[in-house]
From Swiss-Prot:
It is a peripheral membrane protein. It comes from Homo sapiens. This is ERO1-like protein alpha. GO terms for biological process: brown fat cell differentiation; cell redox homeostasis; cellular response to hypoxia; chaperone cofactor-dependent protein refolding; collagen fibril organization; endoplasmic reticulum unfolded protein response; intrinsic apoptotic signaling pathway in response to endoplasmic reticulum stress; L-ascorbic acid metabolic process. Induction: Stimulated by hypoxia; suggesting that it is regulated via the HIF-pathway. Changing residue 384 to A: No effect on activity. Glycans are attached at residues 280, 384. The modification Phosphoserine is found at residues 106, 143, 145. N-glycosylated. The Cys-94/Cys-99 and Cys-394/Cys-397 disulfide bonds constitute the redox-active center. The Cys-94/Cys-99 disulfide bond may accept electron from P4HB and funnel them to the active site disulfide Cys-394/Cys-397. The regulatory Cys-99/Cys-104 disulfide bond stabilizes the other regulatory bond Cys-94/Cys-131. Its EC number is 1.8.4.-.
Length: 468
């Protein structure tokens, strides 16, 4: 009798467990969980967490930054898209309409931007005007003031400086043209396949301090890779010094950011009358879903946040350069220029207040000789990547690739110029540290792209929430 009652109670208990939900299988992960479950908490080599960045960027910074980037000073970027590829000759040009770039007509660009003196402060501009006037009057060099000669020499020296992390375009070249970035937005162009893979393969395989024996996960140009190769790669990566590991993560973060943009501004529908652009959830999942990418997607997104922190830190450190009274965002429209400078300083002070900035003091520490060599290797590798952008077969992709690598290169230049920035005079020309207009425009637009990516991650997270 006791056994019978025991069996009955056990059976009733099992029925109760099933009916109450206990013992049920867990519901399958949502698509949002597969893409974002690992994209949370603290970032490697940092004291900052993803959630703090999301709140700061999406609600305090993003709206004001977008307003600034829509202004004339930041929307016009001069670029040479016709420079030949320095590494190989067989470039396959993308023939799709969406790959094309529409340059500005001469009368579309404000005169203040086109003038040769836009790079410098008001006092420096006056010195250049003196130089230009002397040249127009046919005066000999001796007629220039000693101060002017010194300024011109210093600027020339700086523009050829070994502190630059990018090989910048010669904007005086007849092939360099102004492009309206708002009319040529970064979005999906259809440029993909072996030609696009080749660009990224050269960047990762030859410029990220990686030996050939170490295989990169999910390399589309390699075959037969598995879990062992992935484990070997990350064991190698973790064994690198912090500088080389950071270099790889910056490039991976930039790659991830670009892929977010392409997924967020995808050509969804095309008719004779219009094109419809929007979020392509499938495209995003193929690039970042933890299962579809064998765990790589979430890692790439965390590297995007790392890139965000690096550029955010650079902007916080360069504030004194823009605070100088004679610095202008000069376009020729005095009222607009003053308003834009106020907005710029407001944004930079907001960035300065960010509580968990990346600490770059761990970079290039230790033995001075070794640190100097490592910094030079770091600079040359990144400079080489900026040259690879001239090999991109899609002109729209080339435009944004050149701008974003120059922007990141400018951020690195700022991070490693702390003493020069601290020693700048409060007014007058800054001989030791200055930024050209090209560097300023690329710096803020590049950060604007990363800021947009972080904002778009919130949009994709919401879109994927109910998809399994």
């Amino acid at each position: 009798m006791g056994r019978g009652w025991g069996f009955l109670f056990g059976l009733l208990g099992a029925v109760w467990l099933l009916s109450s939900g206990h013992g049920e299988e867990q519901p399958p992960e949502t698509a949002a969980q597969r893409c974002f479950c690992q994209v949370s908490g603290y970032l490697d080599d940092c004291t900052c967490d993803v959630e703090t960045i999301d709140r700061f960027n999406n609600y305090r910074l993003f709206p004001r930054l977008q307003k600034l980037l829509e202004s004339d000073y930041f929307r016009y970027y001069k670029v040479n898209l016709k420079r030949p590829c320095p590494f190989w000759n067989d470039i396959s040009q993308c023939g799709r309409r969406d790959c094309a770039v529409k340059p500005c007509q001469s009368d579309e660009v404000p005169d203040g931007i086109k003038s040769a003196s836009y790079k410098y402060s008001e006092e420096a501009n006056n010195l250049i005007e003196e130089c230009e006037q002397a040249e127009r009057l046919g005066a000999v060099d001796e007629s220039l003031s000693e101060e002017t000669q010194k300024a011109v020499l210093q600027w020339t020296k700086h523009d050829d400086s070994s502190d630059n992390f990018c090989e910048a375009d010669d904007i005086q070249s007849p092939e360099a043209e102004y492009v309206d970035l708002l009319l040529n937005p970064e979005r999906y162009t259809g440029y993909k396949g072996p030609d696009a893979w080749k660009i990224w393969n050269v960047i990762y395989e030859e410029n990220c301090f990686k030996p050939q024996t170490i295989k990169r996960p999910l390399n589309p140009l390699a075959s037969g890779q598995g879990t062992s190769e992935e484990n070997t790669f990350y064991s190698w990566l973790e064994g690198l010094c912090v500088e080389k590991r950071a270099f790889y993560r910056l490039i991976s973060g930039l790659h991830a950011s670009i892929n977010v943009h392409l997924s967020a501004r995808y050509l969804l529908q095309e008719t004779w009358l219009e094109k419809k652009w929007g979020h392509n959830i499938t495209e995003f999942q193929q690039r970042f879903d933890g299962i579809l990418t064998e765990g790589e997607g979430p890692r790439r997104l965390k590297n995007l946040y790392f890139l965000y922190l690096i550029e955010l830190r650079a902007l916080s450190k360069v504030l004194p350069f823009f605070e100088r009274p004679d610095f202008q965002l000069f376009t020729g429209n005095k009222i607009q220029d003053e308003e834009n400078k106020m907005l710029l300083l407001e944004i930079l002070h907001e960035i300065k207040s960010f509580p968990l900035h990346f600490d770059e003091n761990s970079f290039f520490a230790g033995d001075k000789k070794e640190a100097h060599k490592l910094k030079e290797d770091f600079r040359l590798h990144f400079r080489n990547i900026s040259r690879i952008m001239d090999c991109v077969g899609c002109f729209k992709c080339r435009l944004w690739g050149k701008l974003q690598t120059q922007g990141l290169g400018t951020a690195l230049k700022i991070l490693f110029s702390e003493k020069l920035i601290a020693n700048m005079p409060e007014s007058g020309p800054s001989y030791e540290f200055h930024l050209t207009r090209q560097e300023i425009v690329s710096l803020f637009n590049a950060f604007g792209r990363i800021s947009t990516s972080v904002k778009e991650l919130e949009n994709f997270r919401n879109l994927l929430q109910n998809i399994h």
